[in-house]
Amino acid sequence: MSIKAEEISTLIKQQIQNYQSDIEVQDVGTVIQVGDGIARVHGLDNCMAGELVEFSNGVLGMAQNLEESNVGIVILGPFSEIREGDEVKRTGRIMEVPVGEELIGRIVNPLGQPVDGLGPILTSKTRPIESPAPGVMDRKSVHEPLQTGIKAIDALIPIGRGQRELIIGDRQTGKTSVAIDAILNQKDQDMICVYVAIGQKESTVRGVVETLRKHGALDYTIVVTASASQPAPLLYLAPYAGVTMAEEFMYNGKHVLVVYDDLSKQAAAYRELSLLLRRPPGREAFPGDVFYLHSRLLERAAKLSDAKGAGSITALPFVETQAGDISAYIPTNVISITDGQIFLQSDLFFSGVRPAINAGLSVSRVGGSAQIKAMKKVSGTLRLDLASYRELEAFAQFGSDLDQATQAKLNRGARTVEVLKQDLNKPLPVEKQVAILYALTKGYLDDIPVADIRRFEEEYYMYLDQNHKDLLDGIAKTGNLPADEDFKAAIEGFKRTFAPSN
């Protein structure tokens, strides 16, 4: 059988017609220097600020410095395998993280990858980690309470949904414990919580996760962790990843509580990156834009207007002080950005006042309008009582011959301090807080020995639960105080059954 030339030419023509040449154009650069989590790359002339790039070993990086001859890239992973001369590809994507309901109950790193060993997170939705904060007209003033379950905070320094409240203090003063209690108290409150651990020890993060799991709080919490062993770029990105996950819920009309533990370590990581990228250092060697680093993060916490779905993000950023110095650079920056601060003092902590909140230096600038009416009424004089007690306490150490009014103030102050103490991981419903503070401010505790106050409190709650549940339910439902005579009858009824210790 002979093959005809025409057949061959027809076959060749068909093959040529069917041939599709898929040309893939890639923007590729070359690593000219690498080390300490930073790579300088030549040849990525069209790279965008904040764009993700991919190294030849699959590790991702983020473009930070766009210079004339090279691009400064922070490496988001191990950099020991990256060598000079390696190829770097542009991805054309800005840094994004996965978002959505599927993340609830999971522990992820700042790139949104799971680190809890429970398999992949099945969500296709992502959001860019840098996005503009809601504008002025998209917001509404803070008016709904966020109950932390901590008497000292809910009474003296109330927090509203959509507020930014700084928690500031030295190391080992109970900052994390305050935030964990606030998360535990959001059970059945229709709140989603995001806990962002920045530069914490892995064992500490594990402890926090176990506490949340034990109390059933992991059912509504996302944990984002960039531990101390992670590269600095991941510590810098962690808070932005956390707030991005929270924004997805806020824009869908939900309420979110975000805890940043803590921003001092993020600022230190950002300082490290900036110095390695050869940006000019400023005060305490921080770069000039360290204020913007925190302001653009915390401005994304907001209470949205009804037209935008009325969702909210409440932010509890932490800042660690050195020897109680709240006038240092990062503390003053964050104090000026937030709507108030809760100052935890080591002297109080070691003297047994826990939570160790200094009522004089702590303030909530917008939370007062979010307090329920009942709490407003019973906590009105508390701050003054405490302040005058602290003043007189120092004075009373020198002289014993005190007049009756001064002695009464000291007695009331000692009982106030005792009532505001609270055990770890035992947040208290707001109606019970109101009940004990009512008894305190109306003078029903003045004849109870200070040593018996904690026992009195516990037995009082049990008595109310058994005999006057209607009073507690009334406060919880309406937010108002019951009639004075009803409350008076309940307290006096309990006091008749209470036996002080000898």
UniProtKB/Swiss-Prot annotation:
Protein name per the record: ATP synthase subunit alpha
Gene: atpA
Top EC category: translocase
Residues carrying the site annotation Required for activity: 362
Record membrane topology: Peripheral membrane protein
Assembly mode: F-type ATPases have 2 components, CF(1) - the catalytic core - and CF(0) - the membrane proton channel. CF(1) has five subunits: alpha(3), beta(3), gamma(1), delta(1), epsilon(1). CF(0) has three main subunits: a(1), b(2) and c(9-12). The alpha and beta chains form an alternating ring which encloses part of the gamma chain. CF(1) is attached to CF(0) by a central stalk formed by the gamma and epsilon chains, while a peripheral stalk is formed by the delta and b chains. The F(1)F(0) complex interacts with SpoIIIJ and YqjG; YqgA is found in the same complex.
Ranges in a coiled coil: none
Subcellular location: Cell membrane; Membrane raft
InterPro entries from the UniProt entry: ATP_synth_asu-like_sf, ATP_synth_asu_C, ATP_synth_asu_C_sf, ATP_synth_F1_a_nt-bd_dom, ATP_synth_F1_asu, ATPase_a/bsu_AS, ATPase_F1/V1/A1_a/bsu_N, ATPase_F1/V1/A1_a/bsu_N_sf
Pfam families, alphabetized: ATP-synt_ab (PF00006), ATP-synt_ab_C (PF00306), ATP-synt_ab_N (PF02874)
Molecular function (Gene Ontology), one example: ADP binding
Family, per entry: Belongs to the ATPase alpha/beta chains family.
Keywords, alphabetical: ATP synthesis, ATP-binding, Cell membrane, CF(1), Hydrogen ion transport, Ion transport, Membrane, Nucleotide-binding, Translocase, Transport
Reactions listed under catalytic activity: ATP + H2O + 4 H(+)(in) = ADP + phosphate + 5 H(+)(out)
